[in-house]
Amino acid sequence: MTSKLKLFIAVWFSCFLLSPALSARNKFKTDTVTLISFNDFHGYFVQDGVAPGASALVQSVLDEKATSPHAFVVSAGDNFSGSFFSKITKGEPLSDMFRLMGVTVSAVGNHEFDWGKEYLQTNSKPDMTYIASNIEAEEDCGKSWLPAYKILSCTLKNGAPFRIAFIGLTTVETQYKTSAENVVGLRFEHPYAAAAIQLAYHLKKEGKIDMVVLLCHLGTDMETPACFQECNTKMLPYMEGVDAIITGHSHRVVLDKINGVPIIQAGSYGRYIGKLQFKISPIRKSEAFRVEYIGGDTIKTDRGKRHVEMEQLVDKYRKKYSFDEILTRAEDDLLRSGRTYSTMGGLVTASYVEYFKKNMPADSCSLPLIGVNHAGGIRNDLYKGTINRLEAANILPFAGQVVAFRFTGKMLKKLLDDGWNNPNGRLQACHLTVHMDGNSVRAVEYVTGGESRIIEDEEECIVVLDDYITDGGDQYDSSLFVRPVLSFNEKNFVTTDAFIDYLKSKPVIHRSDVPVPNIIRTE
């Protein structure tokens, strides 16, 4: 062998050994990436009988992050609207909560629109990005809409970047799951088609993408064979190129795998944390990586944990707004239900009737007065014991307007019939006996002062309710609400105020005193 050839081989071999990239790749066998998620927090910053609170959630997430060097924390939507605390503070502590957990991306939930699309686009201040690939703005909407996806990255053991594309998807139910005025100028497109477009076209412009995650505010559960509840979402796990799906909306605890794709949902109100882990392996003679799902968990948030800074922020607002003021005492549990008329539904709707009486002349109250509320607007239960202002307000956290309309008996029957058969839950009511033939309302009796009488088809009555369903929310018939009681409606009374006022007027509440409708079925 010539000296020149020996020198060439020595130089070549030393370069090979000293090459950082090749040396690192030789040493690097596998790495792990973790996705930590939560969903449907709904602004439940304060710990109560329902939620562990923001302080416990933050600390629990940070503890999970500490065990995973490459952890990404994301939200599947419905972050700020849904608690009275959040309504009053306009979600003010959310930016701090996201900052402390390191959340930088979220799906758009239907309740993200409760304060208007302008708030979502410009006034929400979390240091993060809302993504929605299946929401498109009409030309006259006035602003470009939110991005369809966001790419996050970390550095693996070998020094190479690992890039994850999160594609946002939102339930098309948003069109009737928030007030119609809040989504004017927006179209909610088919989720599968929207995600497929991002995968097939737009992500290709972003260079090498190592992993794709669908970050969805779409309902899932463990009882449905396809896992996804909405018909237009059931094929999402079969979309080529998708590595994981993180979901929300249905408030269920879900950990499933369809077509080899892990699907997770972490309950609601911060009660659970979702965790998916993936083994990352280099593909020989390639810059690409093999992504393999190696396990997941839905971890119950530890209510005993506290993050000091988050706790101090929440306490500041509790004191400012007197959230701990005691209003009354419940001698029994007062529970809601979407399947039948409930104690909580009767209590809420009775408060509307009493508020109407309190604020209107006596001659305006001579007609039968019936309170109603859509099932989805009653968000919580009250349990035996003292009830403070925040606990009461969290029953009606959206704080809509309480309004009144003139109805005939025939219109009332239609409203109650529609409400009994509404797929979003039974319409709640008070001061009634409802005669049912199967699932159809045959007749309605008005019950007051220990007496009852049939409300005839042509007889006038007044329905007092929250304004959400009056413009078609939850798929109710807006044509029923054509004769407003303007002298009441123009005062812009708030549902939550009416309910709190009602509770304060009662030193003690017994379940037996709540005017829950009675049902009489035809044999």
Predicted regions and their residues:
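Bacterial Sec-dependent N-terminal signal peptides
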Residues: 1-27
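Residue-level detector of intrinsically disordered/flexible regions characterized by low predicted structural confidence
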Residues: 6-8, 259, 281, 520
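Residue-level detector of intrinsically disordered, flexible termini
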Residues: 9, 20-23, 70, 243, ...
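Low-complexity, intrinsically disordered or weakly predicted helical/coil tracts enriched
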Residues: 10, 225-226, 440, 447
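Acidic, metal/ion-coordinating pockets
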Residues: 25-298, 343-355, 362-371, 402-406, ...
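Catalytic centers of hydrolytic enzymes
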Residues: 28-34, 44-46, 58-66, 100, ...
